[in-house]
Design a protein with these regions (language model features):
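Nucleotide/phosphate-binding catalytic cleft detector across ATP-hydrolyzing
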Residues: 1-165, 173-247
Length: 247
């Protein structure tokens, strides 16, 4: 009876709380929320603009182009919480959006976290989730969650290796018998690549671009392995000397 009530009035949630994006999955349904980990606030304030709605996709559209007095903030850096209050606000928004009209009881939540975070940083994630409306909270290392999600035989007496490149951290691990045999986590990942692209275009072509443009460029022509021929992609930005838009 209690199980029926729980399924009727709230959901068990699996959350990938990432530096770049946050995903929330539901049992038997898959991914329900997949939005950027961004919040738009007035400068010097933690009050979310748009009556609390400038979170995720809406806030991401403001990155690098916010009007004067408003800033788009990422509450996480390198896989850990950098702004506890804004992270709590963002999580509460996403949890309520994921549960929709069925949110009555506080949902049970499991959150994927980088293997490199400290006990203090783990506690910050735990507390942030509880304050955002979660009931019971569990944490799981991202590499293990990624292995399970990729369908690797992580419970068998075999060695499976996985490399998970996120926005703030890169996780490499060997999984076997439902546990992590060896792992390495570094705070260099997708955001580092985006920053390198921004700096390169400014130095080489005197062109200033934003985070979104750098990410789009990375996705369009980036490759994890050498290609037979180089890819090209036209990009628009502002001339660093004149401030005039150009390509």
């Amino acid at each position: 009876m209690l199980g029926w009530v729980r399924k009727r009035f709230c959901s068990d949630l699996a959350i990938d709380l990432g530096t770049t994006s946050t995903q929330i999955g539901l049992p038997g349904e898959g991914i329900r929320i997949d939005e950027p980990s961004v919040v738009a606030v007035p400068r010097g304030s933690h009050r979310v603009v748009g009556r609390g709605a400038a979170v995720g996709k809406l806030a991401y559209q403001m990155l690098g182009r916010t009007p004067e007095g408003i800033t788009a903030v990422r509450p996480l850096r390198h896989g850990v919480i950098s702004d506890f209050e804004l992270c709590e606000t963002m999580l509460r928004y996403f949890i309520r959006k994921a549960c929709g009209q069925t949110m009555g009881l506080r949902p049970r939540v499991i959150i994927a976290v980088p293997g490199c975070i400290t006990p203090v940083e783990r506690r910050a994630v735990f507390n942030s989730a509880e304050r955002a409306g979660a009931g019971r909270v569990w944490l799981i290392e991202e590499s293990k969650a990624a292995g399970i999600g990729a369908g690797l035989p992580v419970s068998e007496p075999l060695a499976s290796m996985i490399c998970d490149i996120g926005g703030g951290t890169t996780e490499v691990a060997v999984l076997s018998l439902a546990d992590i045999v060896a792992s390495q986590s570094i705070r260099t990942a997708g955001d580092t690549m985006d920053d390198a692209i921004v700096r390169y275009l400014r130095r080489r072509y005197s062109l200033r671009i934003g985070e979104q443009t750098a990410e789009q460029l990375k996705i369009a022509i980036g490759s994890a392995a050498p290609l037979d021929h180089e890819l090209t992609h036209e990009v628009s930005g502002l001339d660093t000397a004149s401030g005039i838009p150009r390509k």
